Amino acid sequence: HDMNFNLKFEKLNKKNYQRKHYGKILTVRLPCNPIFPIGPIYLADHIHKCFPNIKQQFIDLAIIPINKVSKYLARKIDQFRPHLIIFSWRDIQIYAPVDGRSGNPLQNSFEVFYSKNILKKIRGSWGGLKLIASHYGEIYRNTSLVKMGLKRAQKYNKNVKVILGGGAVSVFYEQLGNLLPKGTIISVGEGENLLEKFIRGDSIEEERCYFAGQKPRNKLIHEQPSGTVKTACNYQYIKSIWPEFNWYIEGGD
């Protein structure tokens, strides 16, 4: 009888431990075009509705000058010391250089394939190369930010976890597994259910995600997402966890 009670007590403790475990969650939108970060905001709002006791902070690296991004992220992590960091990677940018030439990747490849004019051919492939280089540059930069964020947060909580999701991830999720620290959760799709289960300590096997260092399930991207009921976003709450909220409302810079 006594033993049974102890077992129950341990279970209870374990549950509480898990709750405490993710007491602080930092959501980071990785650099991209500064468009209002509706996706990650909905996530933060959803977490707050499910777990009102969890402390959250939100940072949007899209509005930070690119040469200050790394320092800014490090400072935020030092101040907040999160147990879980969610990185949202909106899309892979297509940077048009100043001369505007490398604008359209499809246009470039078509020019290469179909033009008789050799100069045009060279220009086409050069545009494509520039574009590929900027993709790689961005992938390198963002994966470096994730690695740095994890390392920094581990100084304060050695069991800190990282989840990476967003539009770009859905596109090349298979390649990311090798570029990120082992154990990073790579999420394809929305992420609300995944986060809810993860914070509760439930199994996330059914969710559209996989751990860096393991192989993703075959055709992961084509699995049906499990629906979540969308509710109105509590913008008062969002303002409280994201000091720069008004940057967008006031029309940028």
Predicted regions and their residues:
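Acidic, low-complexity intrinsically disordered segments
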Residues: 1-253
